[in-house]
């Protein structure tokens, strides 16, 4: 019994020891918690608020922890207010800076565009000035060239006029000096006076002959230089240029026109000089009349040089068009003849093996090749370019055809009995047959 009572006492003592003892700090915390609960319940029950007791207000105001929390919240609010104020102050500043940046960009763009416009205007003005200068130079060069040609043509005329004008004066002086000797005996004139009167006219004739010889030599030199340049150009251009025996015919025609005019003027002056030779029994009237005729002829020739410029240009354009057409036709015929040559060469290669067995066939083929005229369009072109007569060659400004082509002579001798139309038809038919054979061979090769 005693042991049971002791155990019960020990258990009660242990429970008493285990129970917490309320300290004054714990009591203050419990009061603060109760007050906080009342405040929370007051805030949550706003439609029907529960009033907070005055004791709770006093306990919360006296608690340091609550004061520190409230101070911290106030600091946060103040910081938020400061941040909002700074943002509000920065907004107009940012707007102002943006406007300034936009204005600066617009001004820079305008300045750049103005600079570009100035540069382009300067470049255009420089280009226009250069173009004007080039056009002026071209016009000056053309005027110089145009002025040099009539000057070159008129210089010998002026010289001849001066000489012709000097000659009558000398003749008049000679007549005046020798007039008393002729008056008593006009039927038997003095031989010395005749020699003196003939000497100026002979000097004029000699000068005219010398000038004509110099001009002929210059023309020959120019023609030789032109022929040498044409040969060099033909060698550079290759075999196709060989089909054109006169590649610079238009240039020769232009040159020939001026040369023919110069020849006409020279002939007029020569005839005038020959007529200016006074026979023994003529007087001053014939000299004056001849001088007037010479002046009229030279003036008409110089006018014709200037008036005929437009007609010459038109004729030159027509000649160029005709020459271009003939050149195109020659190219076409040259292609056809080249094909014919290739075909004949292939036939010859194929028929080399058969020639030993059948010599008559080789003879026939050679005769047909000669008859069909597979020699290229050189002779045809030469026929087309050859002037029809001596007058045409003189009008075109070309020298008269002195040397003939030996190939043309042989062809004319060999084909004297044949008509040209029959030969052309035969050659065309042969070319067509050969082309058909080549086409069949190509088709067979493609199929094979």
Curated annotation (Swiss-Prot):
Positions where Glycine amide occurs in the chain: 308
Keyword ATP-binding (UniProt): no
Gene Ontology cellular component annotations, sorted alphabetically: chromaffin granule; extracellular space; neuronal dense core vesicle; secretory granule; transport vesicle
Subcellular location: Cytoplasmic vesicle, Secretory vesicle; Cytoplasmic vesicle, Secretory vesicle, Neuronal dense core vesicle; Secreted
Region (Disordered): 116-251, 263-429
Keywords: Amidation, Calcium, Cleavage on pair of basic residues, Cytoplasmic vesicle, Disulfide bond, Glycoprotein, Oxidation, Phosphoprotein, Proteoglycan, Secreted, Signal
Gene Ontology biological process terms in this record: defense response to bacterium; defense response to Gram-negative bacterium; defense response to Gram-positive bacterium; endocrine process; mast cell activation; mast cell chemotaxis; mast cell degranulation; negative regulation of catecholamine secretion
Predominant location category: cytoplasm
Tissue: Highly expressed in adrenal medulla and pituitary gland. Weaker expression detected in cerebrum, cerebellum, spinal cord, liver, thyroid gland, striated muscle, lung, spleen, kidney, parotid gland, and sublingual gland.
Signal peptide feature range: 1-18
Sequence ranges of Acidic residues compositional bias: 223-238
Residues the record lists as Methionine sulfoxide modifications: 363
Further remarks about this protein from its record: Binds calcium with a low-affinity.
Annotated protein name in UniProt: Chromogranin-A
């Amino acid at each position: 019994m005693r042991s049971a009572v002791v155990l019960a006492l020990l258990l009660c003592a242990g429970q008493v020891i285990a129970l917490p003892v309320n300290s004054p700090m714990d009591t203050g915390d419990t009061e603060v918690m109760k007050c906080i609960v009342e405040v929370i319940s007051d805030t949550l029950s706003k439609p029907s608020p529960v009033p907070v007791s005055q004791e709770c207000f006093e306990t919360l105001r006296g608690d340091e922890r609550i004061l520190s929390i409230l101070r911290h919240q106030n600091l946060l609010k103040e910081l938020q207010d400061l941040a909002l104020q700074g943002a509000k102050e920065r907004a107009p500043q940012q707007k102002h800076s943006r406007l300034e940046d936009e204005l600066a960009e617009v001004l820079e763009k305008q300045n750049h565009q103005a600079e570009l416009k100035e540069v382009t205007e300067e470049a255009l003005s420089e280009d226009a000035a250069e173009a004007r200068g080039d056009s002026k130079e071209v016009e000056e060069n053309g005027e110089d060239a145009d002025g040099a040609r009539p000057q070159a043509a008129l210089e010998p005329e002026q010289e001849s006029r001066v000489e012709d004008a000097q000659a009558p004066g000398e003749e008049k002086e000679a007549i005046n000096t020798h007039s008393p000797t002729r008056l008593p005996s006009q039927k038997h004139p003095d031989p010395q006076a005749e020699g003196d009167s003939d000497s100026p006219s002979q000097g004029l004739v000699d000068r005219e002959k010398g000038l004509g010889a110099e001009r002929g030599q210059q023309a020959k030199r120019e023609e030789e230089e032109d022929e040498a340049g044409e040969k060099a150009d033909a060698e550079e251009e290759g075999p196709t240029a060989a089909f054109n025996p006169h590649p610079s015919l238009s240039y020769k025609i232009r040159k020939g026109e001026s040369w023919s005019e110069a020849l006409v003027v020279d002939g007029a002056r020569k005839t005038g000089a020959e007529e200016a030779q006074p026979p023994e029994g003529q007087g001053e009237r014939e000299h004056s009349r001849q001088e007037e005729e010479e002046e009229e002829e030279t003036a008409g020739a110089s006018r014709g040089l200037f008036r005929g410029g437009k007609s010459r240009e038109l004729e030159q354009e027509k000649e160029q068009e005709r020459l271009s057409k003939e050149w195109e036709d020659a190219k076409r015929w040259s292609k056809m003849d080249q094909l014919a040559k290739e075909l004949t060469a292939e036939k010859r290669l194929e028929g080399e093996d058969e020639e030993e067995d059948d010599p008559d066939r080789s003879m026939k083929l050679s005769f047909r090749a000669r008859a069909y005229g597979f020699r290229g369009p050189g002779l045809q072109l030469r026929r087309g370019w050859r002037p029809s007569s001596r007058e045409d060659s003189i009008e075109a400004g070309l020298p008269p055809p002195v040397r003939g082509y030996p190939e043309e002579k042989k062809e004319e001798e060999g084909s004297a009995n044949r008509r040209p139309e029959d030969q052309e038809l035969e050659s065309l038919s042969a070319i067509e047959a050969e082309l058909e054979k080549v086409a069949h061979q190509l088709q067979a090769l493609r199929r094979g």
